Swiss-Prot record:
The lineage of its organism: Bacteria, Pseudomonadati, Pseudomonadota, Gammaproteobacteria, Enterobacterales. The gene is ypeB. It holds the Pfam family QSregVF_b. InterPro entries: QSregVF_b. It comes from Escherichia coli (strain K12). This is Uncharacterized protein YpeB.
Length: 72
């Protein structure tokens, strides 16, 4: 996990779905777990960032990413 990825997770906006418009770090853990259970994270960089976000949330590290948010 790179610093750049943490910054992206803090600032990337979910582009689709029920939580469209929310930052990845603000997505509910249950939503990310749903993708994991289905083994259907989106392809590419978004899916990779979502998987890392899930790891951050399940390990209780969300507070480390929150300060990296830029104003919208």
């Amino acid at each position: 996990m790179e610093k750049e990825q943490l910054i992206e997770i803090a600032n990337t906006i979910m582009p689709f779905g029920k939580y469209k418009g929310r930052r990845l770090i603000d997505l509910p853990e249950e939503y990310l777990l749903w993708f994991a259970r289905k083994d259907e994270f989106p392809a590419g960089k978004l899916g990779e960032l979502m998987q890392i976000t899930l790891l951050i949330k399940t390990e209780g590290l969300t507070q480390l990413v929150q300060p990296l948010k830029r104003p919208l």
